[in-house]
Amino acid sequence: MSRLEAKKPSLCKSEPLTTERVRTTLSVLKRIVTSCYGPSGRLKQLHNGFGGYVCTTSQSSALLSHLLVTHPILKILTASIQNHVSSFSDCGLFTAILCCNLIENVQRLGLTPTTVIRLNKHLLSLCISYLKSETCGCRIPVDFSSTQILLCLVRSILTSKPACMLTRKETEHVSALILRAFLLTIPENAEGHIILGKSLIVPLKGQRVIDSTVLPGILIEMSEVQLMRLLPIKKSTALKVALFCTTLSGDTSDTGEGTVVVSYGVSLENAVLDQLLNLGRQLISDHVDLVLCQKVIHPSLKQFLNMHRIIAIDRIGVTLMEPLTKMTGTQPIGSLGSICPNSYGSVKDVCTAKFGSKHFFHLIPNEATICSLLLCNRNDTAWDELKLTCQTALHVLQLTLKEPWALLGGGCTETHLAAYIRHKTHNDPESILKDDECTQTELQLIAEAFCSALESVVGSLEHDGGEILTDMKYGHLWSVQADSPCVANWPDLLSQCGCGLYNSQEELNWSFLRSTRRPFVPQSCLPHEAVGSASNLTLDCLTAKLSGLQVAVETANLILDLSYVIEDKN
């Protein structure tokens, strides 16, 4: 018997944020996420030391899922961001950068964690209240009767992901397809509570991006030989569909729970086949036109159905079961017994289609709330990133449908918000502190650390040595290229602000980001004509941004409040 190793005592560390190891690892994580941020963010290649799949990305969801972290504090931070991204899809890097900078900034102040956390909560509440208010100067309404703002929102997501490797023309094409795919999921006669359909992304790797398209209904990939064997159906009415979630292969090992009793001298295989053929006879008598099976259909049953001009398709997989149920109105059949008439559904029509080298069986719905986005890209790496980006964009559109507002992007919301907080804390600190135990000096220190963290997110957009400025009227971001001459006439160097709403021809005064300047009131209440005339805005999802802001501050507060880290080393 081998000797058992004695248990090691748990490792207990006090004041974890004061250790050099923790500060270094936080700094490394911050540099990784910061370098990925924005349209010119740098790509990361992630792979393990034993080879295998290599992930090339700049997206937080792919980055953090492939990034192995071991320190408990980093695990808290990455888990918080991953939970946010799993719920909202967008603003993961924003959340990570803001959280890391908040932790770094307040550590330098020497204030007690209790004071820092209390004031951070006040500032977070101030931010959320302002961003949700009617007077907010960086929030615009989204009109679903017009595609202009919706296209801007989708385009902003695509352009922020450089690993997709899209040209401007390709970006416009894919943006329009994503928007069309989303609009197809909205029921035409929706009243009250809306139940959205689903957009399925079908891979077409190695094809031109411009060949991507959207089709109503579901595409089932098949070989050319299989398609040739399918009999054409000519019918003026809808086609009746039966959908099976159990195997029709006759395999007795897949009978589900329970006991199979077989009489002596009876062939089990023949008994099961007879039952399958009886099932086929019921399908024929019920005038079914199309049989779909998640698993395998026995060749004899398939031939029997084909003889009676019923199309039978098997091995469709679990992924398509939910969309097929929604689109056809079927109830998946899970047994070989008698079929309830309510289990059947229908489709408007079926046809075959070919895209690139792939062949598909196309199910055309009665009502187009399920659609297929055939997504093309040059190679596997670019396609994987584009697929993830399209899923993000579709989710953002769903969130925007629930809360039809968008925030100005390109860093303008962050600089505007920082200007608003500075003005509020300098000119009306009593409204923030109220009956709190904190002093105005502590509020000024924390507010500056908070605003500096917001501006650090903005600074992360610049990766090529350029300068970032803010104007003293709107509080928006303006970028200057690294090789620009140092002149006082900024309008000659600046064209548009980060979000694209304002141009430099207005009478504006600028200052460098993070430079010392007097607090000012950023203009609120966006003029309707300014928003309506802008056709190429950079926008962010309001719901995702608010959640990211909240997660960043709350996670930073949680980490700052840690007094001990206890690790079980066994």
Curated annotation (Swiss-Prot):
GO terms for molecular function: ATP binding; RNA polymerase II-specific DNA-binding transcription factor binding; unfolded protein binding. Changing residue 488 to T: In a patient with Bardet-Biedl syndrome compound heterozygote for mutations in BBS12; uncertain significance. Widely expressed in adult and fetal tissues. Probable molecular chaperone that assists the folding of proteins upon ATP hydrolysis. Plays a role in the assembly of BBSome, a complex involved in ciliogenesis regulating transports vesicles to the cilia. May play a role in protein processing in limb, cardiac and reproductive system development. May play a role in cytokinesis. The substrate-binding apical domain region is sufficient for centrosomal association. Belongs to the TCP-1 chaperonin family. This is Molecular chaperone MKKS. It comes from Homo sapiens.
